[in-house]
Amino acid sequence: MSTNPKPAFRRILLKLSGEALMGEEGFGIDPKVLDRMAQEVKELVELGIQVGVVIGGGNLFRGEGLAKAGMNRVVGDHMGMLATVMNGLAMRDALHRAYVNARLMSAIPLKGVCDDYNWAEAISLLKSGRVVIFAAGTGNPFCTTDSAACLRGIEIEAEVVLKGTKVDGVYSADPMKDPDAVKHDVLSYNEVLERELKVMDLAAFTLARDHNMPILVFNMNKPGALRRVIMGEEEGTYIKNLN
């Protein structure tokens, strides 16, 4: 039983990697994983949490390999942005099937497919209890979806960016390779930078730090972990200003 029955956060930005949607598949979207994630988001909405979502596109397209093979980086990034729109459409559909009101906003205009990103409208929708999915990254090449998550989190005045990954927090080393890797429960922004811990790319991380936006890294593949994070239970790694 939770020692903290009230949610720890009122408005969140949930960042999901595209890879998280693959499940056990090597590519694309696993429908079972998609539906489970939609159900977990539904639980938050039922708790009265305002939820914004940013999804990566790595399950459908990775631009780095093609860029190394000679493709123009801007073209590759545009393709990656469109991959995030495809994931966003899938998530919106899964939420609608779970009877959750959701809107998809894209940083690139896609008339007839989804809404254009509008900051004021997004906040209004969140206040009305709708889940808002932000697609197409920031709309600019050379910016990761982690940067988009931090940017949108700051814009919608979220209390935290929740980064759902394949591991249950931030470790001193890669836990997949180093059996002696130690998990951190709480870190300051400076500790992450000084120890060169892999949380997200530097541009995204410094954006969060400069705007005092806490980041909580947790394992989205672990059933119930998202709810535990929201309820303030010990789950994942919490990165914030400790001064």
Curated annotation (Swiss-Prot):
Catalyzes the reversible phosphorylation of UMP to UDP. Belongs to the UMP kinase family. The keyword Nucleotide-binding applies. Keywords: Allosteric enzyme, ATP-binding, Cytoplasm, Kinase, Nucleotide-binding, Pyrimidine biosynthesis, Transferase. It is an enzyme of class 2 (transferase). It is found in: Cytoplasm. It comes from Shewanella denitrificans (strain OS217 / ATCC BAA-1090 / DSM 15013). GO terms for biological process: 'de novo' CTP biosynthetic process; UDP biosynthetic process. Allosterically activated by GTP. Inhibited by UTP. SUPFAM superfamilies: Carbamate kinase-like. One of its GO terms (molecular function) is ATP binding. It catalyses: UMP + ATP = UDP + ADP. It holds the Pfam family AA_kinase. Pathway: Pyrimidine metabolism; CTP biosynthesis via de novo pathway; UDP from UMP (UMPK route): step 1/1. This is Uridylate kinase. ATP binds at K15, L16, S17, G18, G58, R62, T165, Y171, D174. Homohexamer. Its EC number is 2.7.4.22.
